């Protein structure tokens, strides 16, 4: 269900049509992936829903590259093409020694978005992180993800696991997830409706462990924890204990 026209040169790539891209270093939570991100709880991530877009890439001699994306959308109310419904983004990917980094500049649904991502080796493990700033009608909002991943071999089976902390700047600052509480957070509701966000809280911890049972079969349990709910429950129980 994807049709696009592509040109690939020695250092340049141009594509126009239905396609999918993934940006950022988050494995479960992806604040920098502003175009059709995966639900963190998605089981099958082999196929990603795409957008009708223009994509361009320029590869430098040192391995760094620049990517640009333009997505034109219509206003669902009047059917007109509008800049406030469209997206234009440029991302620079570079190497600094053994480290990698990304710089993002975008105009997304009429809002300016800046992003910084980095990954590096940390004692044999891989550290990854994204920091994203969005200039909304309600002011500046930051979102971030940081994670640590490690791979090893036990009993001739390949294992890998990672731990991620996610700060969702658009999420509820407290544990009020009622309809009235969510209605007071239109920035969150807009992103939920557009399929850009899947979490309504603010602080999350996610972890995953994969074991390769056979070359064609692997087992991957994931755990997601809403830290606000956990701490609120702990505080209530502790308060009840100390009160008596």
Task: Specify the residue positions occupied by each region the protein language model found.
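Membrane-embedded beta-strand positions of outer-membrane beta-barrel proteins
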Residues: 16, 56, 68, 103-105, ...
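Outer membrane beta-barrel
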Residues: 1-65, 71-73
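Detector for outer-membrane/organellar transmembrane beta-barrel domains
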Residues: 125-227
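Residues that define the transmembrane beta-barrel architecture of outer-membrane proteins
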Residues: 1, 8, 48-52, 84-88, ...
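Outer-membrane beta-barrel translocator domains and adjoining extracellular loop/strand segments
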Residues: 27-33, 78-84, 113-116, 139-145, ...
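Repeated loop/turn-to-beta-strand initiation elements of outer-membrane beta-barrel proteins
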Residues: 11-14, 63-66, 96-103, 124-128, ...
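Residues on the lipid-exposed face of transmembrane beta-strands in outer-membrane beta-barrel proteins
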Residues: 2-7, 54-58, 90-94, 116-120, ...
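Transmembrane beta-strands of outer-membrane beta-barrel pores
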Residues: 9-11, 20-22, 72-74, 96, ...
């Amino acid at each position: 269900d994807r049709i696009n026209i592509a040109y690939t040169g020695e250092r340049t790539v141009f594509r126009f049509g239905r396609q999918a891209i993934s940006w950022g270093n988050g494995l479960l939570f992806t604040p920098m992936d502003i175009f059709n991100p995966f639900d963190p709880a998605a089981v099958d991530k082999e196929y990603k829903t795409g957008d009708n877009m223009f994509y361009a890439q320029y590869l430098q001699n040192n391995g760094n590259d620049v990517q640009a994306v333009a997505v034109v959308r219509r206003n669902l109310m009047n059917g007109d093409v509008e800049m406030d419904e469209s997206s234009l983004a440029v991302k620079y990917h570079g190497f600094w020694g053994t480290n990698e980094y990304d710089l993002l500049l975008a105009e997304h649904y009429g809002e300016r978005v800046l992003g910084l991502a980095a990954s590096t080796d940390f004692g044999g493990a891989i550290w990854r992180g994204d920091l994203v700033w969005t200039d909304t009608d309600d002011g500046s909002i930051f979102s971030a993800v940081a994670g640590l991943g490690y791979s090893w071999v036990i009993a001739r089976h390949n294992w890998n696991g990672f731990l991620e902390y996610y700060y969702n700047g658009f999420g509820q600052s407290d544990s009020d997830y009622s309809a009235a509480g969510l209605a007071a957070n239109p920035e969150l509701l807009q992103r939920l409706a557009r399929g850009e966000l899947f979490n309504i809280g603010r602080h999350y911890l996610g972890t995953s462990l994969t074991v390769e049972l056979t070359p064609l079969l692997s087992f991957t349990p994931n755990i997601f924890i809403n830290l606000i709910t956990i701490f609120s429950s702990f505080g209530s129980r502790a308060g009840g204990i100390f009160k008596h």
